[in-house]
């Protein structure tokens, strides 16, 4: 399973996401299926554009997201948005996968 390093971000303004992209980052959102709030993170385009990682984004596989080197979230890739004429990723949507045991 692919492990992606991420940095938690608190501001979600359009100007902030533009700065993230300008500095070589990629904004992303981890959506929760339950009513808990969504998690906004920043990924590195350098990690995302690695040849071994590109095929994961095309297949909608499960990934592990390591946030601030503190905790890991398992998620499924929901949507990947690419720049219109460049080859870089500009936004990713993830869906948080929870493991619930049935009794």
From Swiss-Prot:
Q: Name one GO molecular function term.
A: 5S rRNA binding
Look up the record and give one Gene Ontology term from the biological process aspect: translation
Write out the GO cellular component annotations: cytosolic large ribosomal subunit
- Does the keyword section mention Ribonucleoprotein? yes
Q: Which Gene3D superfamilies match?
A: Ribosomal Protein L25, Chain P (2.40.240.10)
The cross-references to Pfam families, in alphabetical order and at most eight, read: Ribosomal_L25p
Q: Which domain of life is it from?
A: Bacteria
**Keyword set for this entry?**
Ribonucleoprotein, Ribosomal protein, RNA-binding, rRNA-binding
User: Is Ribosomal protein given among the entry's keywords?
Assistant: yes
The chain's coiled-coil residues are none
Q: What does this protein do?
A: This is one of the proteins that binds to the 5S RNA in the ribosome where it forms part of the central protuberance.
The family note in this entry says: Belongs to the bacterial ribosomal protein bL25 family.
Please describe the quaternary structure of this protein: Part of the 50S ribosomal subunit; part of the 5S rRNA/L5/L18/L25 subcomplex. Contacts the 5S rRNA. Binds to the 5S rRNA independently of L5 and L18.
Q: What is this protein called?
A: Large ribosomal subunit protein bL25
This protein's species is Blochmanniella floridana
């Amino acid at each position: 399973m692919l492990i992606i390093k991420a940095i938690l971000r608190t501001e979600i303004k359009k100007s902030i996401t533009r700065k993230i992209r300008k500095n070589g980052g990629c904004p992303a959102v981890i959506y929760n299926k339950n009513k808990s709030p969504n998690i906004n993170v920043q990924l590195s385009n350098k990690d995302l554009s690695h040849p071994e990682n590109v095929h994961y984004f095309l297949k909608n596989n499960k990934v592990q997201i390591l946030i601030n080197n503190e905790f890991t979230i398992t998620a499924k890739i929901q949507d990947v948005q690419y720049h219109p004429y460049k080859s870089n990723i500009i936004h990713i949507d993830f869906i948080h996968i929870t493991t619930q045991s049935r009794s």
